[in-house]
Amino acid sequence: MTAAYLPSILVPLVGLIFPALSMALLFIYIEKETIA
């Protein structure tokens, strides 16, 4: 039963949090490279 509404939660979660996380990691990586 939970699988019915799981995609409606998972899609926005992946669509918003994954890009934000990758942006943050990329930003930290660039900052470390710049400082080093």
Swiss-Prot record:
GO terms for biological process: photosynthesis. GO terms for cellular component: chloroplast thylakoid membrane; photosystem I. Keywords: Chloroplast, Membrane, Photosynthesis, Photosystem I, Plastid, Thylakoid, Transmembrane, Transmembrane helix. The chain crosses the membrane at residues 9-29. May help in the organization of the PsaL subunit. PANTHER family: PHOTOSYSTEM I REACTION CENTER SUBUNIT VIII, PTHR35775. Belongs to the PsaI family. This is Photosystem I reaction center subunit VIII. It comes from Pyropia yezoensis.
